[in-house]
Amino acid sequence: QNFGGYAREAYVASKALVGKPNKQNSKFIMFGRGRSGSTLLTSMLNQSKLVNFDKEIYNRSVLFPRQFLKNRSAIYSGDVYGFKLLSYQLRNQFGVEDGKVFLNELVQDQGYKLIYMKRENLVKQTLSKHYARFRGSWHESKKVNRTKMIVSIQDFIHELNEGRKLDFLEEDVLVGIPNFEVIYERDLEENDAKIKLMLNICEFLEIPTFRPEIKLEKISSKQVADYIDNWSELEQAIGKTKFSNFLADIE
């Protein structure tokens, strides 16, 4: 995977070298974690003719991450350039301390705006990740027939602990950095909330407002037992951990 990242880095550098660099009027980072609604928000933002939203550019290691970002933004057209950065990618590519410096450089020195994606219920977020991995599909554009899965309780508890570590990391690296916070449960579960969110984000990014078409469907049911075959056993196991407080919001 590292070789693929280095090859992509070299390709982007060559394109930036021979092409005329594009200068955007606005730039932003979408920062957070998987299963926080970032793909849904990306699909809505990309419906603006002004926005050119790049992907997770650090999902593979690169040798010169700061220059890589400059090259990526240089080859993208459009008035607004954005890219997605997951917190584990920041940790893996930069380390925590340099990750803080990197985010500060982007926001304070280079004029990037930061959209912070988060989810209040860590258990629901982890369930969603497990089910997406099981189905081999992270997002759907139409309704689907759902099949059930059996979750490894030990693996699930381990992922909850890893998720808590990322909670602390995100809190740490964002200290002192202005950001627009998007909470999945508040802003992305209902269509009316999504429309309101888009109006506020357009204002934050200083672009004309628009009404997006909602194209993606949730792949998991609201009833956990509909897609987790051993939910009763998993629920009991979670209830004996420090994550038991998240169970109150789960149907």
Residue map of PLM features:
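PAPS-dependent sulfotransferase catalytic core
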Residues: 1-87, 220-223
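PAPS-dependent sulfotransferase catalytic domain
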Residues: 87-179, 187-188, 192-210
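Glycine-rich, flexible loop/turn motifs
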Residues: 53, 122, 212-215
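A cross-taxonomic marker for long C-terminal extensions/tails that follow the last structured domain
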Residues: 246-251
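Generic signal for short, ordered secondary-structure residues
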Residues: 20-24, 30, 105, 149, ...
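The conserved 3'-phosphoadenosine-5'-phosphosulfate
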Residues: 61-63, 148, 173-245
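Intrinsically disordered, low-complexity regions
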Residues: 14-15, 66, 93, 100, ...
